Amino acid sequence: MKAPPGRRRRAARPPARTHRTTLAFDSTGTARLGIIPRHGRVVTEFADLTQRGASAARIGNRTLTPADLVAVVADCLIADARDDLHDDPAGITLTHPVGYSDQQVGELRAALDAAGLQRVTLVAEPVAAAAWLEAEHGPLMPGLALVYDLGGASLDVTLVRVGAGCPDNPVMGTLRSRDFGGRAFGALMTARAVHGRSGGEPGGSPAPDLAGELRGEHVRESLELVYRCLRLADVTMADVDRVLVVGGAARPAEVARVLGEELARPIVIAADPERTIATGAALMARRAAASAAPAEPVSAARPWVFSRRGARRSARVAAAAAVSAGAIGLTLAVPGDAVFAALSQLGVG
């Protein structure tokens, strides 16, 4: 189907699957994603490699680092997204927080390779978000977009170059604060309710209108992080063409409304902002798979496997072709979000 004259056809929206960011291992060492069994150990709080004291796990005679656990989850999700991925190879992109150091990205890359996932591409979250922006609202003129990622456990503000001619690394500056997000706002609401400042009885739930007012205040207070990010990149708000709002805590209407009023720039937000990054990752994977040349089989060390179908798949991973009829984008939320989202886009073009 062709788009109407003067309008660009939007990219098809990939179907989504979401899971809790938890891993349980049975007696055979097989990983179970997103479940909390009645008996046995559950591993949580491993998703953010920047978090001090992030969980590790010992399975059999192997100790799994947080990066290893992320690779296990990615392997489980890939198996879940496609019934037999390695019989019908697809492009795969896994996003990571933009604030990861080179060492942390290297640890994640090494863990994926050890799990037999050498063809998974790593990309920073705001770069994937910008890919969604280009697909939904492009073609974009060369310029700057500010990605306001309000998640469950933190707020990430990132300046990204968009449009034709942007460099391989389009990120100009980024800052993170754990003082904002779903968890911080929930604590604020609880404090107001406990101290009887909700307009109702002490200990009661805050009234809906006050909840919206508090959320607006929460967003306004976060603007200092936005301005600090602008100063870091040596630009002003006048240099920013649009603000892209993403993240699971960005869904309430007050978030986009307050940002639009205070920043005086066009606000772009998807109907489901928690999916924006994963959708962008899937679109990037599809483009990469469509443009790649067939890969030659390579020999590799036997991968360690913990997913339920890993033994069947790992024998085929080295011979998988790079040209694909589909794509998968994976994004891992920080602990406060507690979800790992996988999206599969079937069909290239």
Which ranges hold each PLM region?
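Gly/Thr-rich phosphate-binding beta-strand-loop-beta motif of the actin/hexokinase/Hsp70
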Residues: 1-15, 19-21, 26, 135-171
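Conserved phosphate-binding loops in N-terminal lobes of ATP-dependent enzymes
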Residues: 2-93, 222-226
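Glycine-rich phosphate-binding loop plus the immediately following alpha-helix
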Residues: 21-23, 162-206, 210, 328-332
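Phosphate/ATP-binding catalytic cores across multiple sugar-kinase/actin-like superfamilies
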Residues: 72-84, 133, 216-239, 252-258, ...
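Glycine-rich phosphate-binding loops at beta-strand->alpha-helix junctions
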Residues: 94-104, 214-218, 235-260, 273-277
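Conserved phosphate-binding catalytic cores of ATP/NTP-utilizing and phosphoryl-transfer enzymes
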Residues: 117-148, 278-290
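N-terminal intrinsically disordered, acidic low-complexity segments at the extreme N-terminus
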Residues: 261, 266-268, 275-303
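Acidic, glycine/GT-rich loop-and beta-edge segments that sit at the periphery of enzyme/chaperone cores
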Residues: 287-349
